[in-house]
Amino acid sequence: MTEFDVTDGVHDVIEDTELPRRLKDEVLATAEERGVTKSQANEIATAVEAQYLDTRVDPLDPVGTVSAQSIGEPGTQMTMNTFHYAGVAEMDVTQGLPRLIELVDARKTPDTPVMEVYLEDEYAEERERAHEVVWKIEATKILALGDISTNVADMVVRIDLNEDTLQERWPRVDSTTQIAGEVAETIEGNLGVTVTQDGTILEFGPSEPSYRELLQLVEQLRDIVFKGIEEVSRVVIRREETERGEEFVLYTEGSAFKKALKIEGVDATRTSCNNIHEVHKTLGIEAAREAIINETMTTLEEQGLDDVNIRHLMLVADIMTNDGTIESIGRHGISGNKNSVLARAAFEVTVNHLLDAAIHGESDDLDGVIENVIVGKPVRLGTGDVDLRMGATQTSD
């Protein structure tokens, strides 16, 4: 017997196939669920193996060219617009062709960085608990907590914190005075001034009487983040139907993936980010590869182009992450780093590449598709890379 509750005969039939481990496990799980006999298992395994072998790429198949065509042709039907995110009011997310270009160019920061934050347990079920996570993620500036005024005669900046706002955002804190004290400490740490506190009223000023310094303090105060993640300007909360039932999901404007995963109540196993470089830094290159595939597929599906085979996107992601870092597909990345002089020159800045190659005395082995097309030689792919030899056997008279 095995970890699957099937007979040894069924197990041996499935294990003798050429299927990869993942597919074998899926067939074994199905055999366990359906309670199949050995003969039935043999039929199933044979059919699955035939399908699997049929989907494998033939030797010398130009997979790169096919992938480029299969992604590029649907790309001509994509829109150039930035749309609202589906179902989320007032949240703009780059979609269509601009988003696809962002991904293959491996831009360091997307035009509209977004995180999709899933929550754990009661945080996902209760709106009040979900809002607690919202206030931990969304950058709360001191300006949003009360009224700010300046007294030029006394050279004092006065902050009158709104008690209702403080209680709404931090309902589990014992008193608003305690929160006001934390605000005062934040101001002192950022501005280097001494803050006097009277309940929820804070006052501070420049060390020396100066109108200019007073105004500078007010300007600096505008940028101070009291709570939350500085990079996240807004969080939208939605109730959605997921594989776990109905739950609250957060969508952010701005991203700081590593910081978000550390927040209590955030489900790190399902939370995602549309910045592939942040995913790489936080979870590693394999996660970045998956992110590239998922983001690219999602972008195509949003445009009604979901019939693009995911293996084309997997090939692109494999090439972009092949050396352990994320490389763009362009003259500053993969295309610009090819060994072939003619292939580099055919992509962009032709004269520069040819001039550099001449200066450094480079040669071209004509191994790839582009360079052989340029010089008019048969491409070394498919039948172009196969030598045929006629066999002759001597027969006796």
From Swiss-Prot:
Pfam families named among the record's database cross-references: RNA_pol_Rpb1_5
Enzyme class label: transferase
Catalytic activity line of the entry: RNA(n) + a ribonucleoside 5'-triphosphate = RNA(n+1) + diphosphate
Gene Ontology, cellular component aspect: cytoplasm; DNA-directed RNA polymerase complex
Subcellular location: Cytoplasm
GO BP field: DNA-templated transcription
Protein family: Belongs to the RNA polymerase beta' chain family.
Name of the protein in question: DNA-directed RNA polymerase subunit Rpo1C
